[in-house]
Curated annotation (Swiss-Prot):
Part of the 30S ribosomal subunit. Contacts protein S5. The interaction surface between S4 and S5 is involved in control of translational fidelity. This is Small ribosomal subunit protein uS4A. It comes from Bdellovibrio bacteriovorus (strain ATCC 15356 / DSM 50701 / NCIMB 9529 / HD100). Keywords: Ribonucleoprotein, Ribosomal protein, RNA-binding, rRNA-binding. CDD domains: S4. GO terms for molecular function: rRNA binding; structural constituent of ribosome. It holds the Pfam family S4.
Amino acid sequence: MSCINESVCKLCRRENVKLFLKGDRCYTDKCSFERRPYPPGQHGQSRLKFSEFALQLREKQKAKRYYGVSEKQFVKYVGEANRAKELTGHALLKFLETRLDNVVYTLGYANSRREARQLVKHNHFLLNGKRANIPSILVNKGDVIQVAESSREMAKIQSAIQAVARRSVPAWLEADHAKFTGTVKDLPNREDVAVAVEENMIVEYYSR
């Protein structure tokens, strides 16, 4: 798990985009980014001109923070994406999207990716009928994710299911909240990825 040492609301403002790190709060008028949509700090509202390198760095940081992965993990995904038989940027996003913690969140069983990581680590989910407590596991087509029977009444999971109506489940996943399950119908395409990131700039950053 990536270590975050500053306010998660400041991260959204720094990257100039909602990263949805605080779950339900991000959809309300209490969202810090909605009230102050500019970078934190004394010169946050100043108009700065960024170099190409700085823009590439910001896109990389944005993606890392959106999915909550460490630099070491991110570099690993970039390396694997370079070896994939498709566009490197698309492969990178596919790896990030199919992480178990991201899938748990996207299916609507956690209020944020950070919360999803905690729930997975604490053995609240099954993958194809077996306990899965590694957030970075990559799911495949046909995999079934299930909330452990003993965890179905947890307040966090119940509140997440109630709040999921605010965001739709993408076509590559199928959620059955009545049965506390989710199925990977297919692997995601680029158009299935909601994060507003320029993946080509990330590839260029690591190609230096």
